[in-house]
Amino acid sequence: MYVVTPLLLRGLTGSARRLPVPRAQVHSMPPEQKLGVLELAIGFTSCMVTFLLPAGWIMSHLESYKKRG
């Protein structure tokens, strides 16, 4: 069984190595206008709230989660 497994895996990965990998052609231009302080503050605040609010909720209720489990 163990002798056959590497041969099977080598057979599966051998055909995958020959497949062409598509490459993305992404071209961008510089922004037309710079972002202001208010726009940066709103974007930064929304990102921080999105990531930190759920983590804070979980951390503040960790003891109740431990008691339930």
UniProtKB/Swiss-Prot annotation:
Protein's pathway: Energy metabolism; oxidative phosphorylation
Keyword Mitochondrion in annotation: yes
Mitochondrial matrix side: 26-36
Membrane-protein topology: Single-pass membrane protein
Motif position, SIFI-degron: 2-19
GO-annotated cellular components: mitochondrial inner membrane; respiratory chain complex IV
One GO-annotated biological process of the protein: mitochondrial electron transport, cytochrome c to oxygen
Pfam families membership: COX8
Transmembrane segments: 37-60
PTM comment, free text: In response to mitochondrial stress, the precursor protein is ubiquitinated by the SIFI complex in the cytoplasm before mitochondrial import, leading to its degradation. Within the SIFI complex, UBR4 initiates ubiquitin chain that are further elongated or branched by KCMF1.
Similarity-based family: Belongs to the cytochrome c oxidase VIII family.
Subunit structure: Component of the cytochrome c oxidase (complex IV, CIV), a multisubunit enzyme composed of 14 subunits. The complex is composed of a catalytic core of 3 subunits MT-CO1, MT-CO2 and MT-CO3, encoded in the mitochondrial DNA, and 11 supernumerary subunits COX4I, COX5A, COX5B, COX6A, COX6B, COX6C, COX7A, COX7B, COX7C, COX8 and NDUFA4, which are encoded in the nuclear genome.
Protein name per Swiss-Prot or TrEMBL: Cytochrome c oxidase subunit 8A, mitochondrial
Encoding gene (name): COX8A
